């Protein structure tokens, strides 16, 4: 890689769709910072908090903020989560034209336009298109993050032989909605005898989620994906901020996950997924 502009130090901008607090995405940033920092790159992290945006003007404000923090076009842009790439796409049409970008934690499908990120009343599966179509014409590479749903459910069945129902914890973000649909599809195909119970931020409060978990017995498997809520949701912030710690305390059956959410701290029982360290290595070597 070479810096754009004579004498400019090469730089990498890491855009995060939300923030860098989750261990499975924080590791990617830390490895990029370590590896490329040693090679003389300046690495800048910019969290975008996209789920909190409710207007198109909000997206433009984020782009203005990005350009203020990165006045000189970077050498490379790493987008953690494809929503961050969608928000930055107008920059790749103008200020950052032809600059290479890498989309991390990508799936096969994504939204074609940023407005879908705020118009969540639409049917998610009807609006998603192949990621290859969205990035066509741009100097963009994407690294998929596999989700091992079938293997994780098989693990739950092995540890809970009386399993008759699977409760799935997720939020309003489209990646969560897409994963929920994938879980339902796997249950229909491979586990037709297991009932499905969705537990979503769109239908219950955090307090009610914890109450529901407390009512389960070992016939119910619990699979956690995400529980992101903005401050605009008027929720009990202590419960929201500590939901990952509290779910295990309230739930009788163990709680499994499809991605690493620091299972070593005892809040989750585990599952089948790619470790943050392994995924980060793939990213920095791309």
Functional labels for PLM-detected ranges:
Residues 2-286:
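Short hydrophobic alpha-helices and adjacent helix-cap/hinge residues
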């Amino acid at each position: 890689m070479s810096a754009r502009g004579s004498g400019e130090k090469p730089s990498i901008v890491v855009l995060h769709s939300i923030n860098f607090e989750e261990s499975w995405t924080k590791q990617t940033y830390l490895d990029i910072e370590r590896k490329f920092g040693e090679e003389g790159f300046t690495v800048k992290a910019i969290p975008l908090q996209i789920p909190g945006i409710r207007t198109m003007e909000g997206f433009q404000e984020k782009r203005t903020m990005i350009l203020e923090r990165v006045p000189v076009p970077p050498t490379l842009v790493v987008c953690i989560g494809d929503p961050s790439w969608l928000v930055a796409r107008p920059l790749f049409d103008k200020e950052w034209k032809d600059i290479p970008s890498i989309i991390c934690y990508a799936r096969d499908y994504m939204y074609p336009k940023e407005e879908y990120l705020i118009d969540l009343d639409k049917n998610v599966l009807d609006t998603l298109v192949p990621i290859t179509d969205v990035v066509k014409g741009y100097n963009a590479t994407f690294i998929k993050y596999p989700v091992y749903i079938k293997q994780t459910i098989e693990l739950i069945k092995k540890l809970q032989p009386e399993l008759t129902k699977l409760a799935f914890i997720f939020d309003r973000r489209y990646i969560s909605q897409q994963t929920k649909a994938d879980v339902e599809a796997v249950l229909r195909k491979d586990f037709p005898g297991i009932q499905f119970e969705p537990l979503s931020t769109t239908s219950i409060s955090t307090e009610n989620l914890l109450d529901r978990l407390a009512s389960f017995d070992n016939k119910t498997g619990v699979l956690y994906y995400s529980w992101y809520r903005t401050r605009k949701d008027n929720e009990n912030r202590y419960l929201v901020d500590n939901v990952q710690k509290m779910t295990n305390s309230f739930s009788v059956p163990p709680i499994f996950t499809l991605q690493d959410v620091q299972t070593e701290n005892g809040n989750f029982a585990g599952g089948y997924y790619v470790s943050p360290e392994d995924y980060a290595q793939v990213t920095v070597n791309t």
